[in-house]
């Protein structure tokens, strides 16, 4: 019995070491920028999107500008599969000529999503992954040079992406295509309300630099129908 237990424990230890090695070599963290079982990322994002709000029965185009500071936690329950949750603060602004409507950087944002690495970063092949996530935020906007809240803006965004990356030493460049769609609801101070939407497809490129095996920095930029830049710091712990 004792020999059997030692044999089983030895197999378990070998399996654990091999599994961690396989995850580290074949399934690198490309977007969160680290290798390991759990990843924590703090980042700032600034984006501009085209949206349309229905006001008094007519669609009015706006530039929806947002600034976000988020904390994102990602866990890998299985090889190639990653689940994440995020929370943070957001400041929103709607621009349509003058005046604009702007909110303070104090609104709550939260969300989550899933990512799957279909093809690992091995030898000459890049890592290829798919991601899908949902976020929600609520902001109170004030007319430019105004003193009171003119209306409340609730925004829910669905975003998906296809990404390829390749680790080259301590640097990992990546790029891909993402789609996004916004569902927007607004309500002003006198009780009038409406809805709107926006979304399209954008290209993005970025890169990470691994400062240590556990600590990385990254930068990202997307363009076309959405203009976004992202910078962040990432800490990864192997489980």
Kindly give the residue locations of the regions a language model identified.
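Short glycine/proline- and aromatic-enriched beta-strand/turn motifs that initiate or cap beta-hairpins
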Residues: 19-77
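Short loop/turn motifs that connect adjacent beta-strands in outer-membrane beta-barrel proteins
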Residues: 25-36, 75-80, 119-128, 167-171, ...
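Transmembrane beta-strands of outer-membrane beta-barrel proteins
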Residues: 38-42, 83-85, 126-132, 173-177, ...
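Transmembrane beta-strands of outer-membrane beta-barrel pores
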Residues: 44-50, 59, 87-93, 118, ...
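Outer-membrane beta-barrel translocator domains and adjoining extracellular loop/strand segments
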Residues: 51-57, 93-102, 140-151, 184-194, ...
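Glycine- and aromatic-enriched membrane insertion/assembly motifs of diderm outer-membrane
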Residues: 58-128, 132-139
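Residues on the lipid-exposed face of transmembrane beta-strands in outer-membrane beta-barrel proteins
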Residues: 71-77, 85, 112-116, 134, ...
């Amino acid at each position: 019995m004792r020999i059997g237990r030692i044999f089983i424990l030895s197999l378990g230890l070998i399996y654990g070491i091999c599994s961690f090695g396989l995850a580290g070599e074949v399934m690198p963290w490309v977007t969160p920028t680290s290798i390991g079982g759990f990843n924590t990322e703090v980042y700032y994002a600034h984006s501009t999107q085209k949206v349309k709000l229905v006001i008094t029965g007519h669609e009015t185009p706006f530039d929806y500008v947002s600034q976000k500071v988020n904390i994102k936690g990602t866990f890998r329950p299985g090889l190639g599969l990653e689940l994440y949750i995020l929370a943070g603060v957001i400041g929103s602004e709607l621009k349509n000529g003058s005046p604009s409507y702007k909110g303070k950087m104090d609104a709550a944002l939260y969300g989550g999503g899933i990512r799957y690495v279909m093809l690992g970063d091995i030898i000459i092949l890049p890592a290829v992954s798919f991601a899908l996530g949902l976020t929600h935020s609520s902001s109170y906007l004030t007319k430019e040079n105004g003193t009171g809240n003119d209306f409340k803006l609730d925004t829910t965004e669905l975003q998906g992406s296809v990404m390829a990356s390749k680790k080259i030493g301590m640097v990992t460049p990546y790029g891909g295509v993402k789609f996004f769609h916004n569902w927007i609801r607004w309500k002003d101070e006198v009780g009038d309300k409406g809805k709107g939407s926006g979304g399209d497809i954008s290209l993005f490129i970025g890169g990470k630099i691994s400062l240590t095996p556990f600590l990385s920095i990254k930068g990202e930029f997307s363009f076309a129908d959405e203009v976004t830049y992202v910078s962040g710091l990432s800490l990864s712990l192997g489980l």
